[in-house]
Structures are given as C-alpha cells and as structure tokens.
Amino acid sequence: MERQVLLSEPQEAAALYRGLSRQPSLSAACLGPEVTTQYGGLYRTVHTEWTQRDLDRMENIRFCRQYLVFHDGDSVVFAGPAGNSVETRGELLSRESPSGTMKAVLRKAGGAVSGEEKQFLEVWEKNRKLKSFNLSALEKHGPVYEDDCFGCLSWSHSETHLLYVAEKKRPKAESFFQTKALDVSASDEEMARPKKPDQAIKGDQFVFYEDWGETMVSKSIPVLCVLDIESGNISVLEGVPENVSPGQAFWAPGDTGVVFVGWWHEPFRLGIRYCTNRRSALYYVDLSGGKCELLSDESLAVCSPRLSPDQCRVVYLQYPSLAPHHQCSQLFLYDWYTKVTSLVVDIVPRQLGESFSGIYCSLLPLGCWSADSQRVVFDSVQRSRQDLFAVDTQTGSVTSLTAGGSAGSWKLLTIDRDLMVAQFSTPNLPPSLKVGFLPPAGKEQSVSWVSLEEAEPIPDIHWGIRVLHPPPDQENVQYADLDFEAILLQPSNSPDKSQVPMVVMPHGGPHSSFVTAWMLFPAMLCKMGFAVLLVNYRGSTGFGQDSILSLPGNVGHQDVKDVQFAVQQVLQEEHFDARRVALMGGSHGGFLSCHLIGQYPETYSACIARNPVINIVSMMGTTDIPDWCMVETGFPYSNDYLPDLNVLEEMLDKSPIKYIPQVKTPVLLMLGQEDRRVPFKQGLEYYHALKARNVPVRLLLYPKSTHALSEVEVESDSFMNTVLWLHTHLGS
C-alpha cells in the first residue's frame, strides 16, 4: 500500500510535502475601475495577491496576478487571467485610490539585516512611480504598522492625502557615562532646564516599552499619521485620547476628520493577536479643531469599522470585553448624519435547525458594502463550514449566499459595485478564486459563480462531517442539549480500514474552529495513509454563543471528554486500527492532547504537542494573556488580580501537569522560543516531568519561532519530525 511505503521512507514523505506545500493561498484582492469598451461592453480588472511556501529559499513568497472580468452589469460574461504571476518583494501594504487611477504602496528596502531596512511610501500612477517618500529618513515617527490589527493605508476621498498608523517616535536616550554627552561646564541652572526634543535623555536607554504581545513585540504606542502627497509633509494627528491606542482608521465623509478604533492600554497592555475581546471603542477626531468624539459604547470591544459607498453609514463588529477571547459578535450601524446607532445583527444563543448561527469573524473585509449602501456582505463560520452572507442593514435579515452549494468553505476577499471576489476550498481542494455578482435583495441565493483560478482536487482523500451528541453523563447542566462536530478525512483507496491508523487533531483557542477548507497538514497525513479527525468540541465558534459559554470553567474536562467521545465513535463506526491512534495539537489543542494521554493513556500510541499549555498556574505570570488563564478556568478577570489559593488550586486541577503520573504515551514537543502566548517554558516543564518518569519524549526548540510555528523552515521541519515520530511509534 502507498501508505506503508510513505511511512517507511521519509524521503517519499519529503517529496510529497514539497509538492503539496506549493499550493498557493489567496491573501487579498481588489477591483479596478469599470471600463467601457468601444463596443459598449463593460469590464473590470481583478488584482489578486497570493502567498506560497518556497522551500529552497525557506520563506513565504508573495506574488500577484491580474484577471479581466467582462460583464453586463448583472452577470459575468467572460473572465480570465491577464498575464502571468509576478513576485512582489518588499511590499508591506498597498491600496488603490478611490478612483482607481493611483496606488499607494508601503515598501521595505535597504540593508540585509532586519534593523537596517528602511520604509518607503510610494505613489504610483498609470505606468510610473509618481512619488516616493523615505519614511525612515524623515524621522517623523517609528516603523509603520503593516499588521491587520492596527494597520491601515487609507486614501482621502480627495486623493490628496494618505492616512496610516506608525509607532510613535521615541526620545533618544543615552548613558550618564557616554563621554560625548558630558558637559562639565554646565551650571546647575542649565541642567535643570527642559531638554530639547531631539536631545538625548540620560539614563533612559533601558526604559521598558510595553508591547501588544504575540507577533506584536515591536508595537507599543501607535499614532495616526497623515501624508500630504503634494508637499510631502507628514503630520502626526493630535486629539487621540491618551489612554487608547489608535488603529483601523479611515477618512470621515468629506475628509473632515478621521474615524478609528481606540484600544485601552491602561493600566497595561494585554496580548491583542487572536483576541477580539480587548476593550476598545470607535472614535472620530476632527482635523480642524482636534476634538475627539466617542461614537460607540466604551465598555465593550469593537473592530472593523467600514464606511458605506454613499458615505452615510458605518458598520462595525462589537463584542463583550474581558470575556472569552473570541465569541459571537454583534453588527452595529452608525448613521453619520443622524448620529443614531442601531443594532443590525444580534448575538445568536443557539442555532435552530439550519438557521443562521451568528457572526464569527474577527474582521470584516475592507470592501463589504453593496452598491446601494443597504447590504453588508461577510463570511462567517457556521458549524464546521465557512459561508458567505448578506445582511440587510435596514431590516437585519441575514441570507446565505452559499448555502446548498458545494460543501466546502468560502472567504470573501472584496465586493465593489456588487461584484464579489471570493475564495473557495475544501479539505481535498486547494483554494480557488471565484467572482460573482450579488443578486438583488430577496434573491441572494441565486449567485452565479465563475472561476478565475481553479485548483485541481487532491486525489485519494475522502472527507465528511460527523455530528456528535454527548452522552447524558457528559451533558453541561447550565447549557444542555448542545451538540458538536468533527471533520473526518480518510484515504479513499484503502482496501482494509482496520489497517488504517488515525491522527486526532483538536483545535487551539479554545474558541476557534476547524472548517471544511484546505489545510496542508491534514491533507498530507491523509495522503500518507492516515485517517485524520479534526474535532470541534463544545466551546468552538460557529455553534451559537451558548456553546462558547459552556466551556469556561470546564476546560480540561468537557473539551477532553468531547474529543475522547469523538474518537471512540469514529473508531467504532469506521473500524480504523484502534491500536494505532495518535494525537496532534497546538496551543489549546496541545493542552488537550496532553490531557488526553494522561486521562486516557491506553487509547493513544503517540502524541505531538506544539506550544502546549501545561500548567495554567505557572503560565499566569508569564503569558501575554493572563485573562485567558482566569476566564477559561472559570473566574472573572481583573487587572488588579493577586494570587488566590482557591483559584490556583482550580487552575492546577484543570492543567495537564496534574495527570503526569498516568502518562506513558511517547511525546514529541515542538516549542517556539519567541512564543509570547504560551511561553516555551510550559513545554519545558512537561519535558522535565516526563524525563523524570522515563516516558519517551523528544523536544524541538525553534529559536526564532513564535506561537504558530508557521515559519517555512520551522513548519517543514516540524512536519518531517512528526512523520518520523509517527513512524517510530505507530509503525507502518
């Protein structure tokens, strides 16, 4: 069998990985202006950006490709590529101007060493670079934020100014004993005078600047910056409240000011990556007087403000603050001229049948409005799928654009003048690029999709969704009658299922989910002959707010039992080899994997844990998300929390370290030394405990890697070591 050959020959697995890892993924798309041909036809260009792993350069490369879409205003007549792909090097951000005649690009260039790189803001027009500004040399601010949390690059409606977010310029600092700074002739009076803005402050060279945690380590104090394209002048906007950090900004109607999200950073910052619950609000700062106005509830959390095409309305997502990191959100509408805020879509406690289960997305697409400024289009997890939806902002009615179609998952890249650009994939189909027009209100389910880039299905992979109902003794008393799901991938060419080993993968979060989309590792393992079980235990997103709220206070118990129940059900129904079952999980998935080999040591023959949570007690004082430790253990979080014996006992009771004496499963640990979310000392603590008890354990420590272990060199090495570990402990 092919499975046995690949398991016994690592080079075969490496060749398979090299092939499948070449599958690119879409990262962005934008639509050019509408053009009328000399014969009266209409067409638009679609500019797409992709990423792909390059194993020879050991990096993720970015490239772009353009397509032409001919249409009649309501449907696509013809579509196809307009040339080959071109690699884009150094681009951090790019944005088309409102008219489509110009494009702004933030680019890094310069030294080979990371710290020597410079940032340039370029303005392109037609076939030439119109302007280029060396932001690093101008020294108005620090590095520009290119992330999707704070970062933005926004054209003014007049197309004369650019708005972006950058790190606040830090004062120069030096030692008291730096010779060139000493001035022995200065009098006491001169020493007491205020320092000049550009004069170095003595003794401040080691002052601590608190950052925003995982993947945001260089980002501390963001400021809003405006570039005047004609004059080249850069101004840092004033009026932003001192207690918030601004981001996700755009120009207000008429360019009278700037709308932005402000995140509270007092009394200190918590990690913001993957955390939609950070206290924040929507603000407007007037450019003429510098007055700042609060536009939303300041006690909650907001993100993704998006201005309608008619410049009359702003929609945004709103979440409870200091609760589970990710949960069902509300969609709000702010009328710019009446100043009235209205709720469009509320939190959904439970999904009723096949109905809408709520909004579960961390960001709305930059382009999400219909042409008439009445409907908003977005993608959201719905159980174990991700679908596209249109919501009428006047009535609040939500309609699926993809229900009843192919059972994969969709992602909206953009919509402009009702032309949608979307990505579609399944567990055995890499991402495809599709376009289609948003139908009139009431006919949303009749979208006609046209493929611009069609991926080839990966053969010999069969997949499906399993609906699971916990047994009566595992019901949650407060949130009863909740079900959950698992996605099962299995080789379709296996003549004898009893010889098929299985890898069980619980997701991280815990409030995230697996969806029926393309994922490299599960597809790879399935091609090698493994069945792969992806478990969306109770607490996963997409199943209603009640499911999410059922887990805090029950981690290490409810989620563990759900995964074990899913494993037992699938083994019973599919008759896979129960002697060869392995676990593989990262973060909270690693937490569950280590729990399972301690609570059910007879079930699992191998375990791979990536940056796992091991001891919630010791994690509390070292992670960038101490609120996670409290909330998921079942306690409210407050910034002034001090250790409490009862709380610490509960944390320990819910930690995998408690079950160390029962563990006998061989464990492969993979840790990122720069992980701020689950510091690598967590895995090291587990490693020492296993070594002391003679349990087979191997530790891989990646020096420059972060929580996701997603760098190309790290990802490829971790996969090959996973294959070797499975081969050693499951056999072929």
From Swiss-Prot:
Q: Gene3D superfamilies, per this entry?
A: alpha/beta hydrolase, TolB, C-terminal domain
Q: Among its keywords, does the record have Hydrolase?
A: yes
As stated in the Swiss-Prot or TrEMBL entry, residues carrying the post-translational modification N-acetylmethionine are 1
The positions flagged as active site in the entry are 587 (charge relay system), 675 (charge relay system), 707 (charge relay system)
Q: Cite the entry's keywords alphabetically.
A: Acetylation, Cytoplasm, Hydrolase, Phosphoprotein
Keyword Mitochondrion applies: no
A GO CC term assigned to this protein in UniProt:
cytosol
List modified residues, type Phosphoserine: 185, 187
Kindly list the GO molecular function terms attached to this UniProt entry. Answer: identical protein binding; omega peptidase activity; serine-type endopeptidase activity
GO-annotated biological processes = amyloid-beta metabolic process; proteolysis
Enzyme Commission number(s) of this protein: 3.4.19.1
EC class (word) = hydrolase
Subcellular location per the Swiss-Prot or TrEMBL entry: Cytoplasm
Q: Which PROSITE patterns match?
A: PRO_ENDOPEP_SER
Reaction catalyzed? Cleavage of an N-acetyl or N-formyl amino acid from the N-terminus of a polypeptide
Taxonomically, the superkingdom here is Eukaryota
Q: How is its activity regulated?
A: Homotetramerization is required for activity. Tetramerization results in the formation of a gated channel which is involved in substrate selection and substrate access to the catalytic sites.
Per the record, the similarity remark reads: Belongs to the peptidase S9C family.
What is the documented function of this protein? This enzyme catalyzes the hydrolysis of the N-terminal peptide bond of an N-acetylated peptide to generate an N-acetylated amino acid and a peptide with a free N-terminus. It preferentially cleaves off Ac-Ala, Ac-Met and Ac-Ser. Also, involved in the degradation of oxidized and glycated proteins.
Quaternary structure note: Homotetramer.
What is the recorded name of this protein?
Answer: Acylamino-acid-releasing enzyme
Organism source for this protein? Mus musculus
* Gene that this polypeptide is encoded by: Apeh
